[in-house]
Amino acid sequence: PTESRGLGDVYKRQTLGKVNFDSVVIADFDESLKSVATSLLYSDVSPDKEYFISLNQWFNESLIQEESLQPMYYPSINKKNWENYKELFYKKFKKYPNHLSLLSYDLVGLIYYLSFKYDFLTSDIEKLFKDESSFKGKIGIFDIKNNEINHRLNFYKIEKNQTTEIF
C-alpha cells in the first residue's frame, strides 16, 4: 500500500512544467548528446515543443534512428558532397575517410586556389588572407576576409528518421 501511494505522488508532480524558452542548444556529440537530450525529455523539455539544436553531427545515423529526440537541427557540411567524397576516398584507399582528411583535402585546394589567384607569388602571405574572396571546396564554400576564413555551413533537420536540408 505504501509503495503504490508513493508512486501516485510521483505521477501527480510536474517536473519543470511550462518552460520560458523556445530552443535548447546542446553542444555535444554521439552518446553524450543523446544522454543530454533524453534527460531533457524527463524535465518537460521536448523537441515537439522546443527546438533542439546541436553542433555538427556529420549525419550521425544513430540520431536518425532516435525518434524521441526528433526533430533536431544542426549545421553541417554539404551532405551530398560528403557522400561523394566518402565514395571516392573508399574507391581509392579501400577504407572510409575520417573528418580530418576532408578538411585537409579542402585546405590543399585552398592553398592552390590562393597561389593561382596571386600568380604563385606567396611572398606576401598576409595579403592572401586580407583580400576578400571565396573558395568553393569539396565540403562547401569558404569566405576569406580580414585574415579570417569562414566556412558557410548548411543547416539540417532530422525528423521522422530522415535528414532534410533546410538551407
Language-model segments: which ranges?
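Single conserved hydrophobic/aromatic residue that forms the stacking wall/gate
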Residues: 1-11
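Segments of small-molecule ligand-sensing domains
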Residues: 94-105, 112-165
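Short, well-structured alpha-helical segments in soluble
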Residues: 9-19
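Short acidic, S/G/P-rich loop/turn micro-motifs used as interaction or catalytic elements
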Residues: 30-34
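Structural motif
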Residues: 25-27
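Extracellular/periplasmic periplasmic-binding protein-like sensory domains
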Residues: 5, 19-23, 35-105
